[in-house]
Amino acid sequence: MASVKLASLIVLFATLGMFLTKNVGAISCNGVCSPFDIPPCGSPLCRCIPAGLVIGNCRNPYGVFLRTNDEHPNLCESDADCRKKGSGTFCGHYPNPDIEYGWCFASKSEAEDVFSKITPKDLLKSVSTA
């Protein structure tokens, strides 16, 4: 009887050990980020989900953006997203190629004005021509 209890205890600890072992090679997608940094989270495997125009949170990209994009009033993928949310008429995409979404503005000129105050001029050229 004691050996059965001991065997059960060993199996329990072995199972817990498998789940609690830290994955040494894993990349952490947590923390604060800026959508203007390249790559924004220190790894191209993570995405920066903006909480504001210049600050966001690093997240694993799978499934997070679709939910966040719908919930956040200023995140957009197109001008139609901004109009649908009532946040503006122009989706100004971040000048960072690692960020696949943008921020809603009232107009293209407002987006260019805001981004020109934040980003280097060479990054802004790619936004204006897009």
Swiss-Prot record:
Signal sequence interval, chain numbering: 1-26
Tissue-level expression: Major component of both the cotyledons and embryonic axes of mature seeds.
Record keyword Membrane present: no
Propeptide: 64-69, 123-130
SS bond list: C29-C46, C33-C48, C41-C58
Alphabetical list of Pfam families matching this protein: Albumin_I, Albumin_I_a
MF terms (GO), sorted A to Z: nutrient reservoir activity; toxin activity
Family annotation (InterPro entries): Albumin_I, Albumin_I_a
Something else known: The protein sequenced in PubMed:3755437 was probably a mixture of the products of genes C and D, PA1b being of C origin while PA1a is of D origin.
Annotated function: PA1b binds to basic 7S globulin (BG) and stimulates its phosphorylation activity. Involved in the signal transduction system to regulate the growth and differentiation as a hormone peptide. Toxic to various insects through binding to a high affinity binding site in the insect gut.
Protein name as annotated: Albumin-1 C
Organism of this sequence: Pisum sativum (Garden pea)
